[in-house]
């Protein structure tokens, strides 16, 4: 009898311990979750504007006293560049764009020249080139907001760490090294480089020869303002059309430093390893450029009907470029697109032209990146033919106004480049330490989640830190095919290869004359997405059939963080808890049998 009583006392104490363990584990996890959310530090967000030339920029000042500067958002090189106000840059043939403020080193009491007299000749991956000197000075971003994990704006903030000061309205960094452009082969203002570091020994662009002071994101990481050298970019506030392209927009985007804001994109955020770039001269390999695996390209009607403009298995590296107003694709792809939208090629202009009215027909191009499809409205690929010197535009012989198609053959660059039209329609995040990029369809400004402020916060809407090797909310989309890709530029011929005669036209006295094609050519009975079977396969851009390849339209990702619960909590009834209780019951029965 005594043994039986002792057994019951042991059994009761065991169950009490079991409940206590479960309760304690659950409370600890919840407390950690709450603490993490409440102590999340704010993220610096730079407001992005657009100037009258279509360039995306952030406002800043340099020097003491501060000299106002516009820095173009440049995701394909890693350095800060300013336009010098002295020396050769005053020459009208130097290529430097003087409508933006220039930097006067001698007017700044905090400026320090690095290696005085040395000229650095730097050539960028897209063909731009600058001659410049290296200078160290203080910089300050003047249009900055502070946002935390609850997506709330912070109005009373002051963070000072090392040489960085971050508060509501500004982000100041002292002793920043940058290139002072003396001359260039393109018109430019300052540049804010955001790419990874470049490997090219013996070349001025090689990053190993410069200190960490030369890298904007590295400076922020070293000061613990951001956790890793990373950023995300949203430019979908740019709602300009070919008619309003040159109208400046003071605030049309966000450059979020060190974090991801899920309220700025829709659908899946696809994550890719950056594709290596091989320098065609030195064969040096760099892995910090935003180069992605571009798959098939579709033209999509306003009802969702689509046609493949490439081939079923098309796969080629493509460079994302925020500074390019045009995109470069394979000649054959551009010809296929031209067939579908009745565009004509004018050799004397080396441009494709199309009736501007197609901008109102709801046509788009679908760019496939693995399982992800990014849709770019065709209206974003049009530019006006208006000439300010003649105060006139081009017209077709039918009387329809003509627009330029902002697509060029990649024979001009040697690489595929997805420019402004693509960038403004995506949300992108870069982890420069892990050499990865994440891309999603950008949420437009008319979407409620972007235009309306809310105090409600859920796990799938909070801003989260990018950590080395981790981009929040992203789904990995690599494959064995994409892992083997490298970008090795081909020969730049500088001209469009043979264009079929029926797609060409002549231009004279403001009028474009040529055969052209009808917008409503419906020569195919079925128009589901598939590779084009003939050179002139076509369909109606106002067709009514649904697009069969609409995966990204319906896909979604909550992005909610996963909390690992205790395996012994009772409200969830997990398998671990059930197994343990069953073991206790079996032990109890065995004990009773022994006592009896």
Curated annotation (Swiss-Prot):
EC number of the protein: 3.4.23.-
Cited PROSITE patterns: PEPTIDASE_A1 (PS51767)
GO molecular function: aspartic-type endopeptidase activity
Protein name (Swiss-Prot/TrEMBL): Aspartic proteinase yapsin-7
Main location class: cytoplasm
GO biological process: fungal-type cell wall organization; proteolysis
Signal peptide (residue range): 1-25
Enzyme class: hydrolase
Domain of life: Eukaryota
Keywords associated with the record: Cytoplasm, Endoplasmic reticulum, Glycoprotein, Hydrolase, Membrane, Protease, Signal, Transmembrane, Transmembrane helix
Topology term for the membrane: Single-pass type I membrane protein
PANTHER family hit by this protein: BETA-SITE APP-CLEAVING ENZYME, ISOFORM A-RELATED
């Amino acid at each position: 009898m005594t043994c039986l009583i002792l057994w019951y006392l042991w059994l009761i104490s065991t169950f009490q311990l079991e409940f206590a363990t479960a309760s304690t584990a659950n409370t600890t996890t919840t407390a950690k979750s709450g603490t993490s959310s409440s102590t999340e530090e704010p993220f610096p967000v730079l407001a992005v504007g657009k100037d009258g030339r279509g360039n995306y920029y952030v406002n800043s000042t340099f020097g003491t006293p501060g000299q106002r500067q516009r820095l173009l958002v440049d995701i394909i090189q890693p350095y800060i560049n300013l336009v010098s106000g002295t020396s050769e840059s005053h020459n009208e043939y130097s290529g430097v764009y003087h409508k933006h403020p220039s930097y006067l080193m001698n007017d700044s009491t905090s400026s320090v020249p690095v290696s005085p007299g040395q000229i650095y000749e730097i050539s960028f991956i897209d063909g731009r080139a600058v001659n410049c000197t290296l200078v160290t000075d203080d910089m300050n971003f003047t249009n900055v907001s502070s946002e935390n994990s609850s997506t709330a704006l912070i109005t009373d903030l002051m963070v000072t760490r090392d040489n960085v000061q971050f508060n509501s309205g500004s982000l100041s960094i002292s002793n920043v090294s940058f290139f002072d452009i003396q001359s260039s082969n393109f018109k430019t203002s300052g540049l804010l480089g955001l790419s990874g570091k470049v490997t090219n020994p013996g070349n001025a662009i090689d990053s190993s020869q410069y200190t960490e002071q030369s890298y904007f994101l590295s400076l922020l990481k070293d000061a613990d303002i951001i956790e890793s050298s990373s950023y995300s970019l949203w430019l979908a506030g740019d709602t300009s059309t070919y008619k309003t392209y040159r109208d400046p927009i003071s605030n049309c985007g966000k450059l979020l430093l060190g974090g991801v804001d899920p309220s700025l994109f829709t659908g899946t955020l696809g994550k890719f390893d950056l594709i290596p770039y091989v320098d065609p001269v030195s064969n040096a390999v760099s892995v910090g450029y935003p180069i992605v695996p571009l798959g098939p390209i579709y033209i999509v009607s306003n009802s969702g009907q689509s046609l493949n403009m490439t081939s079923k298995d098309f796969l080629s590296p493509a460079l994302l470029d925020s500074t390019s107003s045009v995109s470069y694709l394979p000649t054959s792809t551009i010809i296929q697109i031209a067939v579908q939208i009745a565009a004509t090629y004018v050799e004397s202009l080396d441009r494709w032209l199309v009736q501007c009215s197609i901008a109102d027909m709801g046509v788009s191009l679908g760019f496939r990146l693995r399982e992800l499809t990014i849709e770019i409205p065709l209206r974003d690929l049009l530019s006006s033919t208006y000439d300010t010197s003649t105060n006139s535009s081009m017209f077709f012989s039918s009387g329809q106004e003509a627009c330029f198609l902002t697509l060029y053959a990649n024979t001009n660059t040697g690489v595929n480049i997805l420019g402004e039209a693509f960038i403004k329609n995506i949300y992108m995040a870069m982890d420069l330490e892990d050499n990865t990029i994440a891309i999603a369809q950008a949420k437009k400004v008319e979407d409620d989640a972007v235009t309306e402020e809310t105090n409600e916060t859920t796990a799938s809407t909070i801003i989260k830190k990018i950590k080395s090797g981790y981009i929040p909310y992203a789904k990995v989309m690599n494959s064995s095919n994409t892992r083997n890709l490298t970008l090795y530029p081909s020969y730049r011929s500088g001209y469009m290869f043979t264009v079929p005669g029926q797609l060409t036209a002549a231009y004279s006295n403001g009028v474009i004359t040529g055969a052209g094609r009808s917008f409503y050519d419906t020569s195919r009975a079925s128009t589901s997405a598939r590779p084009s079977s003939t050179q002139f396969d076509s369909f109606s851009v106002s067709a009514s059939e649904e697009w069969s390849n609409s995966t990204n339209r319906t896909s979604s990702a909550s992005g909610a963080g996963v909390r690992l619960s205790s395996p012994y909590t009772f409200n969830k009834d997990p398998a671990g808890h059930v197994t343990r209780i069953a073991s206790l019951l079996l032990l109890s029965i065995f004990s009773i049998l022994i006592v009896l």
